[in-house]
Amino acid sequence: MKRRPGMSVPEFREYYETKHRLIGEKYLNGYATRYVRRFTNPNMDRDGQLRDPEYDVFLEIWYPDQATYEACGKALSAPEVAKEIQEDEEKVFDIRFMRSYLVEECESDLT
């Protein structure tokens, strides 16, 4: 996800970790087993130029199974819950750049 225009990186991280995260925890509790935020940092591109990342945070939410994921989705779509989440998202994110994916993990054993 990308921070809203006009918000600095430190402001974004502070808001996310002190406010938005708490909303996530409130509604994910009892469904998700992990709620992880991975904040991005500037990185060198192939030309050796330091570039700001396209996105500011990647969010991972882990569920124990498909049924729990679906139950959480249903709970999050309740009108009062969806309204609270959306209103806070608009304070911190550039919602034009919000993306969501359901993924499967494949891990290599490198030992």
Regions found by a protein language model. Give the residues of each.
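Macromolecular interaction modules
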Residues: 1-111
